[in-house]
Curated annotation (Swiss-Prot):
HAMAP family: Ribosomal_uL22_B (MF_01331_B). GO terms for molecular function: rRNA binding; structural constituent of ribosome. Keywords: Ribonucleoprotein, Ribosomal protein, RNA-binding, rRNA-binding. InterPro entries: Ribosomal_uL22, Ribosomal_uL22_bac/chlpt-type, Ribosomal_uL22_bac/org-type, Ribosomal_uL22_CS, Ribosomal_uL22_sf. This is Large ribosomal subunit protein uL22. This protein binds specifically to 23S rRNA; its binding is stimulated by other ribosomal proteins, e.g. L4, L17, and L20. It is important during the early stages of 50S assembly. It makes multiple contacts with different domains of the 23S rRNA in the assembled 50S subunit and ribosome. CDD domains: Ribosomal_L22 (cd00336). One of its GO terms (cellular component) is cytosolic large ribosomal subunit. Transmembrane segments: none annotated. The keyword Oxidoreductase does not apply. Part of the 50S ribosomal subunit. Gene3D superfamilies: Ribosomal protein L22/L17.
Amino acid sequence: MSDNITSARATARFVRVSPMKARRVIDLVRGKTVVEALSILKYAPQAASEPVAKVVASAAANAENNFGLDPRTLVISEAYADEGPTMRRFQPRAQGRAFQIRKRSSHITVVVESQKEGAN
């Protein structure tokens, strides 16, 4: 195995957005270049697009600063949202009942890989 590192990752943990909603946004950018993904996320109407964009930008910055990779050649090779801890709240209802409210959180992970210029 060669010593050339061609990928970098970034993770945002305990993000207060449900994993299903985060996955909906992540599916838009998986396999795209970092520049293309950030422009898609900038105009995506979903609330989860902001934390996903932050993680994509962080992964690109990690690749550039830690491994010296060119940010223009980076492609999102892996992106996923895992379920984080769920906060449970109770909402009082009629006749002494209480309904449970689940405030879900997620862990968003993005892996970027350097792709050769001629591979496009």
